[in-house]
Each structure stands twice: as C-alpha cells, then as structure tokens.
Amino acid sequence: MMLDGSALRITLDNFCGNEPVHLTRATVAVSDGADGILPETLVPLTFSGNAGVTIPAGERLQSDAAAFPVEKGTTIAVSLYFAEFTEMRSGVVITGPLSGGYFAVGDQTANAVLDTDTSKKTHTVYFLSDIDVLTAAENRTLICFGDSITAQAWPDYLMERTLQCGDGTTAVIRKAASGTRILRQYDNITYDSYGLKGETRFPREIQVAGADTVLIQHGINDIIHPVGTDVNRFRPWSDLPTAAEMIEGLRFYI
C-alpha cells in the first residue's frame, strides 16, 4: 500500500465476461512477505452485507468498506474464492517486484499459508480491478495506463521510487492490458486475449477514487502489429494507422 489508511474496499469487474460470475467468499489480510498472511489481520469482505455476490457480465461492483488499518509500504493480500465453475475472461497479466499472486484449488481465503500442492504462483489478476483506501483528503492517485510495456515492471519501480522519495501523499496504480491498441481491437479467438481498444478501456479504467493524473504509455501495438495478411491473416496492413489517426486517438484520452 502506498498510503496510510483506516479502511478499504475492493472493486470486482467482469468487464469482458460473457456470463455472470459468482464469488463465494473474499478476504483481505496483511501479507507475511512470502506466500502467506498474518492471520491476526484477516478480515472477511462483504457485499451489501453478504459474504458472496454475483457479478453480471460486463458489470462491476464494490465491496462494503471494511475497517482495515494499513500503513504506507505494507503489502496486503486479497483472496477470492469461486466455488462454481467460473469463466475467467476478465483479467490482466502484470509483472514487477511488487506484483504477483497465487492460483489455488479450493477455498484458501482463510489459510495463513497456501498449500503448496494445490497452489502455484501467477502473474494473472482476475476480476480485482481496484482497492480503495480511506485516507487523508489531501492524498491523490496517479494512474499508469497502457499496454504490455505498462503491464511490465516500470510502474512497480515508480511505486518504489515514490515510496522512497515522495511526500507520502501519492499512490501510483497500474491500468494495463498487454496487446491492446488505441484505435482497434481484434475480433477473433486467436487474439481475443489482446483485449479492448483504448477508446473502450480508457473511460472505464480511469474511474479511480482520488485520481487526478494519468500517465499514458500506449500506441506501440497500433504501429507494430500490422504485418500483412501474407505473414499473419489477422494483421492486415490496412490496420496500420496514419499519423493523423494516432494523434486523434491520443487526443481522445486528453
């Protein structure tokens, strides 16, 4: 966490889902710095007072606010359990020294340490879109928005630098989806995981509590993806934008 706070809530998003997602249980706790949590900090999260919730396709929702004191520099663990077969279409892959998680079989939301035989490390984050912290009014959020470049490590290093050298009033968060472009998106199963175009993503993803600045690193895939149908039938030269189209796409963000 990059800010001190007294309570938090999470946002779950089924943006790309084709069907409802049924969450059975969610918890939050302070991480032990490895593959477990500090059990005395474990707090169940609720949704309108209920342990579970259904997220309709294309929708998102927030948990109830939970009393959860945090200090700047603390690492927390949010655990989600889905008892039913779940379509995992809404998620992103992120890497970096501050990013990562675990995928596990069964309900391990209250486990102090994950069972090594039924869990594995992952860089894919499903459904968890935001973690809001109740903090001082003068604090703010900076959003790093982009594609695979931003899904990699540099936002984490910016977070570390901000924690070390900042004034303690700014949180840095990441909104990145690998393979995405500003102007176009793929309409085939081969590149379905490359996600939505910026025009679709941006208005939704910048709706973050306390955000007043967006740092954009986006557009390289618009340029490098088209290679001609003789090389890749899904990447025609007609997808290559003009300079004017790219400028107009970036102006949409502004």
Predicted regions and their residues:
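Conserved SGNH/GDSL esterase-like catalytic core that processes O-acyl groups on lipids
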Residues: 20, 26-29, 35, 131, ...
